[in-house]
Protein backbone atom coordinates (compact mmCIF):
# COMPACT_ATOMS: atom_id res chain seq x y z
CA UNK A 1 0.00 0.00 0.00
CA UNK A 2 2.85 2.42 0.80
CA UNK A 3 4.35 1.85 -2.63
CA UNK A 4 0.96 2.42 -4.26
CA UNK A 5 0.46 5.71 -2.43
CA UNK A 6 3.99 6.79 -3.36
CA UNK A 7 3.33 6.08 -7.04
CA UNK A 8 0.06 7.99 -6.89
CA UNK A 9 1.61 11.00 -5.16
CA UNK A 10 4.29 11.04 -7.84
CA UNK A 11 1.55 11.24 -10.45
CA UNK A 12 -0.12 14.14 -8.69
CA UNK A 13 3.20 15.97 -8.38
CA UNK A 14 3.89 15.45 -12.05
CA UNK A 15 0.52 16.83 -13.09
CA UNK A 16 0.71 19.82 -10.75
CA UNK A 17 4.22 20.75 -11.83
CA UNK A 18 3.58 20.36 -15.53
CA UNK A 19 0.41 22.43 -15.34
CA UNK A 20 2.13 25.19 -13.40
CA UNK A 21 5.10 25.44 -15.76
CA UNK A 22 3.33 24.87 -19.07
CA UNK A 23 0.51 27.26 -18.14
CA UNK A 24 -2.47 24.94 -18.53
CA UNK A 25 -4.33 26.81 -15.79
CA UNK A 26 -5.59 29.88 -17.60
CA UNK A 27 -7.00 33.10 -16.24
CA UNK A 28 -10.61 32.28 -16.81
CA UNK A 29 -13.68 32.10 -14.65
CA UNK A 30 -13.83 29.16 -12.27
CA UNK A 31 -16.22 26.38 -13.16
CA UNK A 32 -18.96 26.12 -10.57
CA UNK A 33 -21.54 23.41 -10.16
CA UNK A 34 -24.35 25.56 -11.54
CA UNK A 35 -22.45 26.06 -14.82
CA UNK A 36 -22.06 22.35 -15.49
CA UNK A 37 -24.72 20.17 -17.02
CA UNK A 38 -25.52 17.42 -14.49
CA UNK A 39 -25.25 14.63 -17.07
CA UNK A 40 -23.29 11.43 -16.59
CA UNK A 41 -20.54 10.49 -19.01
CA UNK A 42 -22.39 7.30 -19.90
CA UNK A 43 -25.48 9.30 -20.80
CA UNK A 44 -23.42 11.61 -23.00
CA UNK A 45 -21.78 8.65 -24.73
CA UNK A 46 -25.21 7.19 -25.49
CA UNK A 47 -26.40 10.27 -27.39
CA UNK A 48 -26.39 10.63 -31.18
CA UNK A 49 -24.03 13.61 -31.06
CA UNK A 50 -20.78 13.61 -33.01
CA UNK A 51 -17.60 12.46 -31.30
CA UNK A 52 -16.39 16.07 -31.15
CA UNK A 53 -19.66 17.28 -29.59
CA UNK A 54 -19.62 14.45 -27.06
CA UNK A 55 -16.08 15.36 -26.06
CA UNK A 56 -16.99 19.03 -25.69
CA UNK A 57 -20.01 18.15 -23.55
CA UNK A 58 -17.97 15.81 -21.37
CA UNK A 59 -15.39 18.52 -20.71
CA UNK A 60 -18.12 21.09 -20.01
CA UNK A 61 -19.63 18.65 -17.54
CA UNK A 62 -16.36 18.13 -15.64
CA UNK A 63 -15.49 19.75 -12.35
CA UNK A 64 -11.98 21.11 -11.86
CA UNK A 65 -11.20 17.94 -9.92
CA UNK A 66 -12.32 15.86 -12.91
CA UNK A 67 -10.12 17.86 -15.27
CA UNK A 68 -7.05 17.49 -13.07
CA UNK A 69 -7.76 13.80 -12.61
CA UNK A 70 -7.79 13.32 -16.37
CA UNK A 71 -4.11 14.30 -16.38
CA UNK A 72 -3.10 11.46 -14.07
CA UNK A 73 -1.91 8.07 -15.34
CA UNK A 74 -1.06 6.01 -12.28
CA UNK A 75 0.20 2.52 -11.56
CA UNK A 76 -1.43 -0.04 -9.29
CA UNK A 77 -0.05 -2.75 -7.03
CA UNK A 78 -1.12 -6.36 -7.12
CA UNK A 79 -3.30 -8.42 -9.42
CA UNK A 80 -6.70 -7.32 -8.15
CA UNK A 81 -8.28 -3.93 -7.59
CA UNK A 82 -8.65 -3.61 -3.83
CA UNK A 83 -10.86 -1.16 -1.97
CA UNK A 84 -8.14 1.40 -1.06
CA UNK A 85 -7.15 1.63 -4.72
CA UNK A 86 -10.77 1.99 -5.80
CA UNK A 87 -11.25 4.78 -3.28
CA UNK A 88 -8.07 6.53 -4.45
CA UNK A 89 -9.31 6.43 -8.05
CA UNK A 90 -12.70 7.82 -7.06
CA UNK A 91 -11.37 10.49 -4.72
CA UNK A 92 -8.85 11.93 -7.15
CA UNK A 93 -10.95 11.32 -10.30
CA UNK A 94 -8.08 9.43 -11.95
CA UNK A 95 -8.20 9.39 -15.74
CA UNK A 96 -5.81 6.55 -16.50
CA UNK A 97 -4.24 3.38 -15.15
CA UNK A 98 -0.91 1.89 -16.24
CA UNK A 99 -0.48 -1.84 -15.68
CA UNK A 100 2.76 -3.79 -15.96
CA UNK A 101 4.06 -7.32 -15.72
CA UNK A 102 3.56 -7.43 -11.95
CA UNK A 103 -0.18 -6.91 -12.37
CA UNK A 104 -0.66 -9.95 -14.61
CA UNK A 105 -1.16 -13.63 -13.87
CA UNK A 106 -3.47 -14.94 -16.60
CA UNK A 107 -5.85 -13.78 -19.30
CA UNK A 108 -8.88 -14.41 -17.08
CA UNK A 109 -7.36 -12.52 -14.15
CA UNK A 110 -6.36 -9.62 -16.40
CA UNK A 111 -9.83 -9.32 -17.96
CA UNK A 112 -11.34 -9.23 -14.47
CA UNK A 113 -8.79 -6.61 -13.38
CA UNK A 114 -9.46 -4.23 -16.28
CA UNK A 115 -13.21 -4.77 -15.94
CA UNK A 116 -12.95 -3.81 -12.28
CA UNK A 117 -11.18 -0.59 -13.25
CA UNK A 118 -13.92 0.31 -15.74
CA UNK A 119 -16.71 -0.63 -13.35
CA UNK A 120 -15.18 1.49 -10.60
CA UNK A 121 -15.04 4.47 -12.96
CA UNK A 122 -18.67 3.96 -13.98
CA UNK A 123 -19.86 3.74 -10.39
CA UNK A 124 -18.06 7.00 -9.57
CA UNK A 125 -19.36 8.71 -12.75
CA UNK A 126 -15.80 9.12 -14.02
CA UNK A 127 -14.95 9.50 -17.68
CA UNK A 128 -14.03 6.15 -19.25
CA UNK A 129 -10.42 5.60 -18.13
CA UNK A 130 -7.38 4.91 -20.26
CA UNK A 131 -6.02 1.48 -19.32
CA UNK A 132 -2.47 1.35 -20.60
CA UNK A 133 0.51 -0.94 -21.00
CA UNK A 134 4.01 -0.78 -22.51
CA UNK A 135 3.09 -3.52 -24.99
CA UNK A 136 6.40 -3.69 -26.84
CA UNK A 137 8.34 -4.16 -23.62
CA UNK A 138 6.23 -6.86 -22.00
CA UNK A 139 8.31 -9.86 -20.91
CA UNK A 140 7.56 -13.18 -22.56
CA UNK A 141 4.34 -14.36 -20.88
CA UNK A 142 2.67 -16.94 -23.18
CA UNK A 143 -0.12 -17.54 -20.67
CA UNK A 144 -1.03 -13.85 -20.82
CA UNK A 145 -0.01 -12.28 -24.13
CA UNK A 146 1.42 -12.98 -27.56
CA UNK A 147 5.20 -12.37 -27.43
CA UNK A 148 6.34 -9.16 -29.11
CA UNK A 149 9.23 -9.80 -31.47
CA UNK A 150 12.33 -7.67 -30.89
CA UNK A 151 11.78 -4.45 -32.90
CA UNK A 152 14.99 -4.66 -34.93
CA UNK A 153 14.20 -8.28 -35.83
CA UNK A 154 10.57 -7.77 -36.85
CA UNK A 155 11.55 -4.69 -38.85
CA UNK A 156 13.95 -6.73 -40.98
CA UNK A 157 11.12 -9.13 -41.83
CA UNK A 158 9.27 -6.33 -43.60
CA UNK A 159 6.21 -4.15 -43.15
CA UNK A 160 3.80 -7.05 -43.67
CA UNK A 161 5.28 -8.82 -40.66
CA UNK A 162 5.09 -5.64 -38.57
CA UNK A 163 1.49 -5.07 -39.60
CA UNK A 164 0.48 -8.65 -38.85
CA UNK A 165 1.99 -8.50 -35.36
CA UNK A 166 0.34 -5.13 -34.71
CA UNK A 167 -3.05 -6.49 -35.75
CA UNK A 168 -2.81 -9.59 -33.56
CA UNK A 169 -1.51 -7.74 -30.50
CA UNK A 170 -4.05 -4.92 -30.77
CA UNK A 171 -6.93 -7.42 -30.97
CA UNK A 172 -5.53 -9.16 -27.92
CA UNK A 173 -5.11 -5.88 -26.02
CA UNK A 174 -8.68 -4.87 -26.82
CA UNK A 175 -10.01 -8.24 -25.67
CA UNK A 176 -8.05 -8.01 -22.41
CA UNK A 177 -9.52 -4.58 -21.68
CA UNK A 178 -6.70 -2.23 -22.70
CA UNK A 179 -7.22 0.89 -24.80
CA UNK A 180 -3.77 2.53 -24.78
CA UNK A 181 -0.33 1.26 -25.77
CA UNK A 182 2.63 3.36 -24.61
CA UNK A 183 4.45 2.85 -27.89
CA UNK A 184 5.58 2.36 -30.57
CA UNK A 185 9.18 3.46 -30.22
CA UNK A 186 9.91 5.71 -33.20
CA UNK A 187 13.36 6.96 -32.18
CA UNK A 188 16.16 5.67 -34.37
CA UNK A 189 19.09 5.61 -31.94
CA UNK A 190 17.65 3.57 -29.08
CA UNK A 191 18.54 0.01 -28.18
CA UNK A 192 14.81 -0.60 -28.74
CA UNK A 193 14.55 1.09 -32.15
CA UNK A 194 12.98 -0.67 -35.10
CA UNK A 195 15.41 0.93 -37.51
CA UNK A 196 17.99 3.67 -37.90
CA UNK A 197 16.32 4.89 -41.08
CA UNK A 198 14.09 7.92 -40.41
CA UNK A 199 11.57 7.32 -43.18
CA UNK A 200 11.33 3.64 -42.30
CA UNK A 201 10.72 4.52 -38.64
CA UNK A 202 7.86 6.81 -39.69
CA UNK A 203 6.37 4.05 -41.87
CA UNK A 204 6.48 1.56 -39.02
CA UNK A 205 5.00 4.01 -36.53
CA UNK A 206 2.18 4.87 -38.92
CA UNK A 207 1.44 1.22 -39.68
CA UNK A 208 1.29 0.16 -36.03
CA UNK A 209 -0.88 3.13 -35.06
CA UNK A 210 -3.37 2.53 -37.87
CA UNK A 211 -3.66 -1.19 -37.07
CA UNK A 212 -4.18 -0.42 -33.39
CA UNK A 213 -6.77 2.26 -34.16
CA UNK A 214 -8.87 -0.28 -36.08
CA UNK A 215 -9.20 -2.18 -32.81
CA UNK A 216 -9.93 0.90 -30.68
CA UNK A 217 -6.50 1.04 -29.04
CA UNK A 218 -4.62 4.35 -28.90
CA UNK A 219 -0.86 4.59 -29.27
CA UNK A 220 1.74 6.97 -27.84
CA UNK A 221 4.86 7.60 -29.89
CA UNK A 222 8.13 7.51 -27.93
CA UNK A 223 10.07 9.87 -27.36
CA UNK A 224 9.89 13.49 -28.56
CA UNK A 225 12.05 15.19 -29.68
CA UNK A 226 14.78 12.56 -29.78
CA UNK A 227 16.02 9.32 -28.34
CA UNK A 228 18.35 9.53 -25.35
CA UNK A 229 19.08 7.72 -22.13
CA UNK A 230 16.06 9.06 -20.26
CA UNK A 231 16.79 6.71 -17.34
CA UNK A 232 19.53 9.13 -16.26
CA UNK A 233 17.84 12.06 -14.43
CA UNK A 234 19.08 15.42 -15.63
CA UNK A 235 20.78 14.07 -18.76
CA UNK A 236 21.55 16.77 -21.32
CA UNK A 237 21.41 16.58 -25.09
CA UNK A 238 23.67 19.22 -26.60
CA UNK A 239 22.31 19.40 -30.12
CA UNK A 240 20.70 22.18 -32.11
CA UNK A 241 17.06 22.40 -33.12
CA UNK A 242 18.03 22.15 -36.80
CA UNK A 243 20.02 19.00 -36.10
CA UNK A 244 17.01 17.46 -34.36
CA UNK A 245 14.80 18.35 -37.31
CA UNK A 246 17.19 16.39 -39.52
CA UNK A 247 17.08 13.45 -37.12
CA UNK A 248 14.41 11.85 -34.89
CA UNK A 249 12.15 14.91 -34.86
CA UNK A 250 11.62 14.45 -38.60
CA UNK A 251 9.92 11.15 -37.81
CA UNK A 252 7.46 12.94 -35.52
CA UNK A 253 6.76 15.58 -38.17
CA UNK A 254 5.78 12.86 -40.63
CA UNK A 255 3.66 10.98 -38.08
CA UNK A 256 1.80 14.09 -36.92
CA UNK A 257 0.66 14.53 -40.50
CA UNK A 258 0.09 10.90 -41.52
CA UNK A 259 -1.80 9.71 -38.42
CA UNK A 260 -3.78 12.81 -37.46
CA UNK A 261 -7.06 10.95 -37.95
CA UNK A 262 -6.02 8.22 -35.48
CA UNK A 263 -5.21 10.83 -32.81
CA UNK A 264 -2.10 9.17 -31.34
CA UNK A 265 -0.46 10.57 -28.24
CA UNK A 266 3.19 11.61 -28.00
CA UNK A 267 5.46 10.78 -25.07
CA UNK A 268 8.02 13.49 -24.42
CA UNK A 269 11.48 12.82 -23.07
CA UNK A 270 12.77 13.94 -19.69
CA UNK A 271 16.24 14.91 -20.91
CA UNK A 272 17.31 18.53 -21.26
CA UNK A 273 17.78 19.87 -24.78
CA UNK A 274 20.04 22.72 -23.78
CA UNK A 275 19.92 24.57 -27.11
CA UNK A 276 16.20 25.19 -26.60
CA UNK A 277 15.77 25.17 -22.82
CA UNK A 278 18.84 24.99 -20.61
CA UNK A 279 16.86 24.90 -17.37
CA UNK A 280 14.00 22.43 -17.81
CA UNK A 281 13.67 18.86 -19.08
CA UNK A 282 11.57 18.44 -22.21
CA UNK A 283 8.61 17.31 -20.08
CA UNK A 284 8.50 20.73 -18.37
CA UNK A 285 9.62 22.91 -21.25
CA UNK A 286 7.22 25.48 -22.69
CA UNK A 287 9.61 26.37 -25.56
CA UNK A 288 9.74 22.72 -26.62
CA UNK A 289 6.22 21.45 -25.92
CA UNK A 290 4.02 24.51 -26.39
CA UNK A 291 6.00 26.60 -28.85
CA UNK A 292 7.65 23.90 -30.93
CA UNK A 293 5.66 20.64 -30.74
CA UNK A 294 2.24 22.28 -30.68
CA UNK A 295 2.89 25.68 -32.24
CA UNK A 296 5.31 24.93 -35.07
CA UNK A 297 4.74 21.22 -35.69
CA UNK A 298 0.96 21.39 -35.25
CA UNK A 299 0.46 18.56 -32.78
CA UNK A 300 -2.99 18.86 -31.16
CA UNK A 301 -3.20 15.54 -29.35
CA UNK A 302 -2.41 14.36 -25.85
CA UNK A 303 1.15 14.67 -24.59
CA UNK A 304 2.53 12.28 -21.99
CA UNK A 305 5.60 12.76 -19.84
CA UNK A 306 8.10 10.10 -18.94
CA UNK A 307 7.82 8.48 -15.50
CA UNK A 308 8.56 10.85 -12.63
CA UNK A 309 11.20 8.38 -11.48
CA UNK A 310 13.17 9.19 -14.63
CA UNK A 311 13.42 12.87 -13.83
CA UNK A 312 10.30 14.18 -15.57
CA UNK A 313 9.90 16.92 -12.95
CA UNK A 314 13.54 17.60 -12.09
CA UNK A 315 14.81 21.00 -13.19
Predicted regions and their residues:
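A substrate-binding/cap region within the structured catalytic cores of diverse enzymes
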Residues: 145-205, 209
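Second-shell residues forming the walls of enzyme active-site clefts
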Residues: 63, 106-118, 122-125, 139, ...
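C-terminal motif of bacterial Sec signal peptides marking the signal peptidase cleavage site
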Residues: 19-23
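Structural recognition of the beta-strand scaffold that forms the well-ordered cores
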Residues: 70-75, 95-100, 129-141, 174, ...
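Active-site mouth loops of central-metabolism enzymes
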Residues: 70-81, 150-164, 234-247, 311-315
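N-terminal hydrophobic targeting/anchoring segments and the immediately downstream early-domain regions
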Residues: 25-140
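Short, acidic/polar
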Residues: 77-91, 161-173, 244-254
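Bacterial N-terminal signal peptides that target proteins for export
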Residues: 1-12
Amino acid sequence: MKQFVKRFICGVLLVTTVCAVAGCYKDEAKTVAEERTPTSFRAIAATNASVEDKADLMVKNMSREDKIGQLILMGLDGTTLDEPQKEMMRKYRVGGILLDNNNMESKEQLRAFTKGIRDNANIASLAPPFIAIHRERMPYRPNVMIPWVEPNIISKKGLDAVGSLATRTSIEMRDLGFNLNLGPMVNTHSFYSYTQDLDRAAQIGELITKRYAVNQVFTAYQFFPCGADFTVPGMRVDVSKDALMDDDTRVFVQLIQSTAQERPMIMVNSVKVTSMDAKNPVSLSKPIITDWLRGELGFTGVGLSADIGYGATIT
